[in-house]
């Protein structure tokens, strides 16, 4: 119904199984975010990031996958995008930074650098 009225859908999930079940509903964006890591400054391990993206893409390659939880700086953003995520989340990483505006800028630059690196001609 959301598509019919022009609304985008974003759904958060914790586990690979949850993400796979939700992917069958075809949201526009899935947020892969292990609950136990939210606000800890500890990012998901590489296996979780790659497995969640792979699992969602096998069901519906049109769903964007955002990785959340523990993203605290530009390097975390860069690394996560390089693993295949289309985006990252970062609430605590920004709001707990000494200079939140500078952290947003750092993260945006890291996103751009990773995007450019992944899409080199």
Pin down the residues of each PLM region.
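Catalytic cores of alpha/beta
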Residues: 13-26, 66, 70-90
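Short glycine/serine/threonine/alanine-rich loop segments
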Residues: 7, 63, 85
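A structural alpha-helix within SAM-dependent methyltransferase catalytic domains
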Residues: 3, 23, 57, 78-81, ...
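Generic structural signal for well-ordered alpha-helices
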Residues: 19, 49-54, 77-78, 101-108
């Amino acid at each position: 119904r959301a598509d019919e009225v022009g609304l985008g859908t974003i759904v958060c999930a914790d586990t690979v199984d949850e993400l796979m079940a939700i992917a069958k509903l075809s949201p526009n964006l899935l947020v892969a975010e292990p609950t136990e890591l939210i606000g800890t400054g500890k990012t998901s391990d590489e296996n979780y990031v790659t497995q969640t993206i792979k699992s969602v893409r096998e069901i519906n390659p049109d769903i964007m996958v955002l990785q959340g939880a523990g993203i605290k700086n530009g390097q975390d953003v860069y690394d996560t995008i390089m693993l295949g995520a289309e985006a990252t989340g970062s609430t605590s990483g920004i709001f707990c930074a000494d200079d939140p505006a500078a952290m947003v800028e750092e993260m945006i630059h890291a996103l751009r650098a990773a995007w450019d690196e992944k899409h080199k001609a």
